[in-house]
Structure formats: structure tokens, C-alpha cells
Amino acid sequence: MAAGSGEQELRAIIRDLGCGPYFLGTFDKRFPGFMAPHKVACAIVNTAGRETGGEHWLAFAWNPRSNTCYLFDPFGFSDQRLKQIYQFEYEGLLRRSALATKDRCVTWKSHQTCRVRVGRCGFSAACSTACAWPTPMDKNPTMNLLTGVPNGMLQSPQVEPTLRRNQEALYRFLNSHSAYFRSHRARIEKATAFDRMNQDM
């Protein structure tokens, strides 16, 4: 997908972060869901078809211990808002994942807006580590770096310093843990500059 962070770049960062054993791959909107109910898994999913070049990156994770599906969306959009903006909804993904479980029931968990991006389409490398961690929102080394803000305040100047600190914290984390990021830091930071984020929205 032609975006600020392409699939190859995302896979390289994810490999550096040690998420490989859990990572199913990068997918477009046709991601089939989590079909192996007994395995911890995560995936990076775009809201558009691969043939379009991509629009917005989301991260999903599956925790079999609690039949819990996690979503990390840097913008914190609701299912209704994602459908309105991108014609993408995750209810179908949940239904497909639930059909693979013994009792056909899953728990759904999301997160406040963090708006941290490594890529024009809203992907944050925090997505990959958040999803790969067995307890994605608890004691996670990247999620604990970030401060969420209410979704309704995403465009408010009041939260801009928080969002900027989130992005800088993520860059520092990736610089410490990803050889790929270190080798391509100047290009990645230019492509994902905070001001560019505002222009793209």
C-alpha cells in the first residue's frame, strides 16, 4: 500500500520489536479476522483495499485466554465513524473471529485517542507492540509511554502538546529498539512530521 509507511517498512519495525511470533501480517480491509482461537495473534489492517494504495492503519490483537479482541486506532474512531469516513466497519471482523471460538463470543476492547503516527495513514508502530503483547493494554512498554485524549478533542489545540509528546516518545522508543528505524529515522520522521499529520486529516 502506497503510504507514508508501507507494508515492508511496518514488517521491518515489527520484526525489530520482537513481535514476529504473534504477527499475522499486514492486510487490507479484507482481513478475515482471527481464525485460530487458541493462539495469541495480532495484525495491522488498512481500512481500504490494497488496490487503492491504502487510507488508514488500524491494529488488531487476539488474546485467547479471555476471548478478547483489541483494537488500537491512533485516532480512536468509533465503528460508525470509521464506516462514515472510510466505509470500513469492524463488526464483520468480530463476527468472523467469534465464529472460530467455542462459545462464539468475544470481548471487545479499544483505547482513547493517542494519535501517534509512523505513516501518513495513521499507523503507529505502537500498534504492533500493543497488539503483540499478551496483555495489550497492561504493562505494555509502548502503551505506557502514551497519554490518551478524549476522541472529541482530537482537533483541539488544548491537547496538541500531549499528542506531540506522544509522537516524540514513540520516536525515542523506536530509536532504542528498532535498527530499521535508526537506519531510516530522518526519512520516517519527515514523512510523519506532526504538522504533516494535521495537513493530511
Swiss-Prot record:
A GO molecular function held by the record: cysteine-type endopeptidase activity
Record carries keyword Disulfide bond: yes
Gene Ontology biological process terms in this record: proteolysis
The entry's keywords: Autocatalytic cleavage, Disulfide bond, DNA-binding, Host nucleus, Hydrolase, Late protein, Protease, Thiol protease, Virion
EC number: 3.4.22.39
Compartments reported by the entry: Virion; Host nucleus
Major location (coarse): virion
A Pfam match: Peptidase_C5
Marked site (Cleavage) residue numbers: G53, G54
Induction: Expressed in the late phase of the viral replicative cycle.
Family annotation (InterPro entries): Papain-like_cys_pep_sf, Peptidase_C5
Residues annotated as catalytic: H56, D73, C121
Catalytic activity: Cleaves proteins of the adenovirus and its host cell at two consensus sites: -Yaa-Xaa-Gly-Gly-|-Xaa- and -Yaa-Xaa-Gly-Xaa-|-Gly- (in which Yaa is Met, Ile or Leu, and Xaa is any amino acid)
Gene3D superfamilies: Adenoviral Proteinase, Chain A
Top EC class of this enzyme: hydrolase
Regulation of activity: Requires DNA and protease cofactor for maximal activation. Inside nascent virions, becomes partially activated by binding to the viral DNA, allowing it to cleave the cofactor that binds to the protease and fully activates it. Actin, like the viral protease cofactor, seems to act as a cofactor in the cleavage of cytokeratin 18 and of actin itself.
GO cellular component, one term: virion component
Subunit structure: Interacts with protease cofactor pVI-C; this interaction is necessary for protease activation.
Additional detail: All late proteins expressed from the major late promoter are produced by alternative splicing and alternative polyadenylation of the same gene giving rise to non-overlapping ORFs. A leader sequence is present in the N-terminus of all these mRNAs and is recognized by the viral shutoff protein to provide expression although conventional translation via ribosome scanning from the cap has been shut off in the host cell.
Function: Cleaves viral precursor proteins (pTP, pIIIa, pVI, pVII, pVIII, and pX) inside newly assembled particles giving rise to mature virions. Protease complexed to its cofactor slides along the viral DNA to specifically locate and cleave the viral precursors. Mature virions have a weakened organization compared to the unmature virions, thereby facilitating subsequent uncoating. Without maturation, the particle lacks infectivity and is unable to uncoat. Late in adenovirus infection, in the cytoplasm, may participate in the cytoskeleton destruction. Cleaves host cell cytoskeletal keratins K7 and K18.
Family listed: Belongs to the peptidase C5 family.
Name assigned to this protein: Protease
Source species of the chain: Human adenovirus E serotype 4 (HAdV-4)
Phylogenetic placement of the source organism: Viruses, Varidnaviria, Bamfordvirae, Preplasmiviricota, Tectiliviricetes
